Regions:
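Beta-strand-loop-alpha "switch" segments that mediate conformational coupling across diverse proteins
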Residues: 182-224
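Phosphate-binding loop that captures ATP/GTP phosphates
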Residues: 29-34, 38-87
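Cytosolic-facing regulatory segments adjacent to core modules
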Residues: 71-84, 88-132
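Conserved beta-strand segments of the P-loop GTPase G domain that flank and frequently precede/overlap
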Residues: 7, 36, 91-92, 124-126, ...
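Well-ordered beta-strand positions
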Residues: 122, 145, 199-202
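NTP-binding/hydrolysis catalytic cores, primarily Walker-type P-loop NTPases
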Residues: 216-299
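Inter-motif core of Ras-like GTPase G domains
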Residues: 134-153
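Walker A/P-loop phosphate-binding motif and the immediately C-terminal alpha-helix
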Residues: 2-45, 116
Length: 299
């Protein structure tokens, strides 16, 4: 079974970009990761791959509303990136909206996540900010590790305060979530927000280059422009997953390192590409991509 990482937070905090960067870090050793976004209000397939025309048959909606969900059905809807062949994605197709499919059901979502977890090493669940979308609370419940991304401002603070009462049940493991400050900028009162929110585990500093990647259909190239604070947050997620593995299977060769604490300001310049850990280790030549249905990708 794969490790399930759920990412949630307030609107515009950088969740989807974080998921893309995390997938590249986790697949640096040729492990396989699957990013799943079930937010029908913003179909992600054309955002991840704007140059490709994917029919609605590739949509995650066909899986979540299927009569019977099994790993074969899930595998058929996974789109594998040619430039990063160890990363697969699932989401809604261009033109789809919340009324394109019947309302999502808890049992179907749990079954879907369970079947998807049999296919790859890591499942990354990129959640909607709307808790009325059943996928988000269900994904938090199913997670081995949950990442909470909050913008360090009044929007993020009040979003967190509004949604915390909805996640008080022990099954959501609210106190065990990692909390990152998303799109942190120089003018943000990080220390004050850290105190009000209850403590940040890491920072995801804003950078124009990262934003440009997100708005130009190059989300999987943004890792090269993340500074050390952002990289340390990604490392922390990987290390927490390794710690969980170590608890399950005691291994004397476990290579777990504490994240580095850098003295530089959070708005420093991006780390050079050569210094980036795993930034483009998986890149392949060529710009054109095509769809694969599990050939050499799944377990």
């Amino acid at each position: 079974m794969s490790k399930i990482i759920t990412v949630w937070g307030n609107p515009g905090c950088g969740k989807s970009m974080f998921c893309c960067n995390l997938a590249k870090v986790l697949t640096a050793g040729k492990q396989k990761a699957l990013i799943i976004n079930a937010d029908s209000s913003t179909p992600m397939l054309p955002v991840w791959m704007p140059e490709r025309i994917l029919e609605t048959g590739a949509s995650i909606g066909n899986v979540l509303t299927g009569l019977e969900i099994n790993n074969a059905l899930v595998a058929e809807r996974v789109v594998i990136l040619k430039e990063y062949p160890f990363i697969g994605v699932m989401g809604y197709a261009a033109g789809e909206n919340p009324f394109s499919y019947p309302e999502l059901k808890y049992e179907k979502i749990r079954s879907f996540i369970s079947e998807a977890s049999k296919l790859v090493d890591y499942i990354i669940l990129d959640c909607s900010s709307n808790m009325l979308n059943f996928f988000t609370p269900t994904a938090i419940e199913a997670a081995d590790l949950t990442v909470r991304i909050i913008t360090p401002d009044l929007r993020g603070l009040n979003y967190l305060r509004a949604h915390k009462p909805l996640l008080t049940d022990e099954k959501f493991h609210y106190d065990g979530h990692l909390t990152f400050a998303g799109l942190a900028r120089p003018f943000h009162a990080i220390d004050e927000m850290d105190h009000l929110i209850g403590g940040f585990d890491g920072l995801l500093p804003y950078a124009k280059e990262i934003e440009r990647c997100g708005t130009s259909g190059q989300m999987f190239k943004a890792l090269a422009y993340c500074n050390q604070r952002y990289i340390n947050s990604l490392k922390l997620v990987r290390e927490r997953l390794e710690e969980a593995d170590a608890k399950e299977v005691v291994s004397p060769d476990a290579d777990i390192h504490a994240p580095e604490t850098e003295p530089e300001e959070i708005w420093d310049t991006p780390t050079d590409r050569e210094e980036m850990p795993d930034a483009d280790a998986l890149a392949e030549s060529g710009r054109k991509e095509r769809k694969h249905h599990g050939h050499g990708f799944f377990k």
